[in-house]
Amino acid sequence: MELKKMRGALVLLWLANIGVALAHINGYEDQPLSKIAIHKTTLALRDSASLRARPTTLGTKVCIYIYTYIYIYYTGEDIDWVTVVLKNSEPHADDWIGVFSPGKFEATLKFELINQRSDFSFALFSGGLSNPKLVAVSNLVAFANPNAPVYPRLAHGKSWDEMTVTWTSGYNIDDAVPFVEWGLKGESRTRSPAGTLTFGRSSMCGGPARTVGWRDPGFIHTSFLKGLWPNSEYVYRLGHRFPGGSIVWSKLYSFKSSPYPGQDSLQRVVVFGDMGKAERDGSNDYSDYQPGSLNTTDKLVNDLKNYDIVFHIGDISYANGYISQWDQFTAQVKEIASTKPYMISSGNHERDWPNTGSYYDETASGGECGVLAETMYYVPAENRAKFWYKTDYGMFRFCIADSEHDWTEGSEQYKFIEECLASADRQKQPWLIFSAHRVLGYSSDYWYAQKDFEEPNGRESLEKLWKKYKVDIAFFGHTHNYERSCPIYKKQCTSNEQHHYSGTVNGTIHVIVGGGGSHLSKFSQVQPNWSIYRDYDFGFVKMTAFNHTSLLVEYKKSSDGEVYDYFTISREYKDVLACVYDGCEPTTHSAV
C-alpha cells in the first residue's frame, strides 16, 4: 500500500476509534486529536509485529454490559466491541495503540466501535504521538450494515405539538428514501418523510476541519412529526426505502409529547453545558479532556423516567474540527436524545472562527464555523445559522440566545430576545427562562473576576430586558463549574433569602451550569456577596414545576446524582404583574 493511501486509512481509523482519547496535554482550547501528528507517519512495518481484530462483522447481536453506576449499555446495529490481539517482539516505551506501556509484549485489548459508515482496522505505532511510525496493521472489521440509520435525536419543532427526529445514515436520497414510522403507543402508525442534508470539506472554514480533521459526515435526515396529542406516549422507528421497495429499519424507540402550553402538570427540565464526550473502552486514559462526560451521561440515562426535556447549552461535542467526534457524541447520548427532546445551544467550540461573522474573533471551533452543530442537530430557529430560538414546554417559556453572535442593543438578536420575553403569557407560562452559552450575566470564575464578573458587553444590554420582563432564571455555561447568584439587578441582591424566594419578581437568579463534563474551571479567590453557592465539580441542574405557583431548582453532582444546592420559587400571577424599582408603568386616576 502506498504511504499516502496508508495515511488516509490510518486517519480514518484514528479519528474513528482509538485516537478519540489521546492527549489533552496542555491548552484550554485543545482537542485531544490535535496532539497526534498522524500526517507525519512513516512506514516501519515489521514481520515480527502483528494485530488481529475480531469479530470481523459487528452489530449482529444485542448484548448487555453493566458498568459502575449500573449503566446498561446496548450494542446492536450502531455500537459494538472488538477484541484486538497484538504481538510485538521489539517493544518500545513510545509504542501505542490506545494506552499502554509495552514490555515483552503480547496482549489482547478491547475497543468499543460505533457505526461510522465504513470499515475499520487497527494499527500499532512506535515513535510516540509526535513522530509516529507505522509498525503493523490489523485485518478489517465492519458493521453488518455500515449505512444503517443510527443515533436518533429528538427536538421540539416550531409549535408545541410537533417533534422532530434527526438521525445519521450512509444513504443518500438517491440510494434510499428516508422516513419515520410513528404513532401513539399501541395504535396504528403513520409515516412521515424526512429531508436529507450533508456537507463537504469546502463548507469548513479552516483547519483541522478542512484538513487532517476532515471525515465524511454521512447523511443527516430530519423528519417532522406533527399534530401530536399533549402528554402522550408515542413510538417510532427510522426507515429507508430502496427503489425496489425493500426497507431497512432501525429498532423501535419511544417518546412522550409535550404538554399544551400552560398545562398544569408535573414538568421536569434538565440543564447543563460543556459536556463533550469520552470513551468507555478506556482509550482516553492517556489524558482525559472531558473527564466528567460519561458520569453526566450515565446519571441522565439512569434517571430517564424522572425528567422530560434536556437543554445542553453550548460546547456540545468539543470536536474542534475533528469531524468524527460528532458521531462519537451522538452515539454517547443516544439513550437520552432518542427518548427526550435534546435542545442545544451554540457555544464557542461550535461556532467561533475568524472572519466568519462570529462575535468573537477566535478559533475555538477548529474550522467548523457552526456547520456541524447546525446540521447534526435541529433547533426551531428561523435560520439555524443564527442559532437563537424560543420554545415552550407546558408552564415554561425558554428564550435561547446565541452568545457567539451580536446580542447587544440594536442587533437583530437583541430584537429577537425582547420579542421572545415580551410574548410570554405569564398567566399560562409563569416560568420565564433565559439561556446562553457564554456568561452574559454574573460569574465569579477566575477569568471573569478580571472582567467585572461577566463576558465583555455581557449584561449591559440585557439586564434591563430581564428586569422589564421579569425573567426568573438565566442559565449559562462556558465556565466549567456550578454557581448560583441571589436574585440580582445591577450587581445588587434584591433579596437576602438563600433558598426560598416568593412574591414580586424583583431580580433574576443567575445559574452557571458549565460542569457537564469538560475539564473544570477555577473560581476567583474572592467570592462576591451576590454569589450564594459555588461548586468546583461536575453536575447538572434539574427544574421541577409542580404547578403555576411552585418551582424547585436542584443542582446535582454527576458523581453520585445527589442534590448539593437547591432553591424554590413560590409566586402568584399578581406577583408577576407587580412593578418593581424603575420598571413601573405610568398610572393615573380615572375621571369617575
Features from the language model and the residues they span:
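A positional/structural detector of protein chain ends, strongest at the extreme C-terminus
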Residues: 1-4, 590-592
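Extended, solvent-exposed regions of the mature portions of secreted/cell-surface glycoproteins
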Residues: 2-145, 282, 287
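Metal-dependent phosphoester/phosphodiester hydrolase catalytic core
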Residues: 144-512, 516-523, 532-534, 542-591
